[in-house]
Amino acid sequence: MKILLASLCLISLLVILPSVFSASSSSEDFDFFYFVQQWPGSYCDTQKKCCYPNSGKPAADFGIHGLWPNYKDGTYPSNCDASKPFDSSTISDLLTSMKKSWPTLACPSGSGEAFWEHEWEKHGTCSESVIDQHEYFQTALNLKQKTNLLGALTKAGINPDGKSYSLESIRDSIKESIGFTPWVECNRDGSGNSQLYQVYLCVDRSGSGLIECPVFPHGKCGAEIEFPSF
């Protein structure tokens, strides 16, 4: 009898544990978003090169990379709901804006849907408790309109002309314009020079407002970095 009771307890525990672990990594469990924009010139002048989308060369402006749920300890959830795949029909009204503000630069050339699918399934599915698929992409587009990074930089005399600028001046000009401290990510061009690649801004859980970042990503840039043309 004791053996039977012990077996039943073990079976019950095995049934309960998966739901506990699932809940801990559910789409409800995140603290804030990183809103990440990338400079196309710095994507394309690396040794990997780039391919323009089917719609043609994007504008010389920062493009959306993604809207990423994140934890305050620096980790993040990913691929939270395989039952909610990307469905382009849900964002049919956004496609014109998506192609302009969220262009793909990956090779081979494409429409952008593979890029958006990746972003939704890896990151967007982890925010479903707050925003659905259409709202996820609409939120990113709204944030892009609110945060004119290129305008903030050019206003401060920081232009995409291949010259080097201080990392401090880049950060300060964005903060002065937008009101919040950015995180700047660098990569290296084909000659190994450090350059402005991506800018991270932090957004509250609702996706509606910018906030000061609870934590910044790892990595660092040099004191002087290039801002390449595109």
UniProtKB/Swiss-Prot annotation:
GO cellular-component term (any): extracellular region
Reaction equation(s) it catalyzes: a ribonucleotidyl-ribonucleotide-RNA + H2O = a 3'-end 3'-phospho-ribonucleotide-RNA + a 5'-end dephospho-ribonucleoside-RNA + H(+)
InterPro entries: Ribonuclease_T2_eukaryotic, RNase_T2-like, RNase_T2-like_sf, RNase_T2_His_AS_1, RNase_T2_His_AS_2
A Pfam family annotated for this UniProt entry: Ribonuclease_T2
Residue pairs linked by disulfide bridges in the UniProt entry: C44-C50, C80-C126, C186-C221, C202-C213
GO biological process terms on file: anthocyanin-containing compound biosynthetic process; cellular response to phosphate starvation; response to wounding
Residues at the catalytic site: H65 (proton donor), E119, H123 (proton acceptor)
Residues reported to bind RNA: Q38, H65, F115, H118, E119, K122, H123
Induction and repression of expression: By phosphate starvation.
Record key words, sorted: Disulfide bond, Endonuclease, Hydrolase, Lyase, Nuclease, Signal, Stress response
Listed PROSITE patterns: RNASE_T2_1 (PS00530), RNASE_T2_2 (PS00531)
Enzyme Commission number(s): 4.6.1.19
Domain of life: Eukaryota
The protein's role, per its UniProt record: May remobilize phosphate, particularly when cells senesce or when phosphate becomes limiting.
Recorded family membership: Belongs to the RNase T2 family.
Name of the protein described by the UniProt record: Ribonuclease 1
Gene transcribed to yield this protein: RNS1
